[in-house]
């Protein structure tokens, strides 16, 4: 985002920052969502700051743009019943969701730190290919503990036998979807190779020490799957 902002060079090019998985992340003194024209956050229940159901927020330092967004989220009204903004919809965050988020917001930094601590434990146990090591800041939020392994199916089978759940984030590229098949073909050998080797380990603040120890022991037992090939 910093590079995109600098490349703006005074031109009026809006920059939209996707913050859906980076609640609380910091680079230097800047939080995620603070640099771009607007930052977009998801409050889906599995996010680092999640509501009870679907929800989200847009942040901006532009007062006029903020007012425009407020109009759009409520039918395009500029005042009660006067619909002046095209593209408006009913997308208000209801009070129950907002109240739940306000309870968890003060805990966000603490919960992110717990996620980072879990990732560090995994790395110390031998998960050398865990992607968090490439974060630009030590204030990354460890939304997912994604790593790269050889023979993913066997690795997953081994962890499952130990009672450990895993996931794949994500199993498809945009170019795999029928909706993009009309576009010119684009060779993506690195991405194609990665999607068959990535696996996500459990990583959430509610994990107990025993659960973390269990995953670490499984990583140590299956260390050979992390060797580069």
Model feature map: region roles:
Residues 1-29, 62:
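Catalytic PLP-binding core of fold-type I/II PLP enzymes
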Residues 12-14, 38, 165:
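Proline-centered loop/turn at the N-terminus of a beta-strand
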């Amino acid at each position: 985002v910093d590079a995109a902002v600098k490349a703006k060079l005074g031109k009026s090019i809006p920059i939209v920052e996707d913050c859906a998985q980076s609640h609380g992340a910091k680079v230097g003194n800047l939080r995620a969502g603070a640099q771009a024209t607007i930052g977009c956050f998801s409050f889906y229940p599995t996010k680092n700051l999640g509501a009870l159901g679907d929800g989200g927020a847009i942040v901006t330092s532009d007062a006029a743009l903020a007012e425009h967004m407020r109009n759009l989220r409520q039918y395009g009204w500029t005042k009660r019943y006067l619909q002046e903004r095209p593209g408006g919809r009913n997308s208000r965050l209801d009070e129950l969701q907002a109240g739940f988020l306000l309870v968890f917001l003060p805990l966000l930094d603490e919960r992110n730190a717990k996620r980072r601590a879990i990732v560090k434990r995994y790395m110390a146990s031998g998960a050398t290919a865990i992607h968090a090591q490439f974060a630009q800041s030590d204030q990354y939020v460890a939304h997912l503990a994604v790593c790269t392994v050889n023979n993913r199916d066997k690795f997953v089978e081994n962890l499952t036998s130990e009672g450990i759940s895993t996931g794949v984030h994500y199993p498809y590229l945009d170019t795999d979807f029928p909706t993009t098949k009309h576009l010119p073909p684009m060779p993506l050998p690195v991405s194609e190779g990665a999607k068959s080797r990535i696996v996500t380990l459990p990583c959430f603040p509610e994990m107990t020490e025993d659960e973390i120890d269990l995953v670490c022991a499984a990583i140590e037992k299956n260390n050979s799957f992390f060797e580069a090939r």
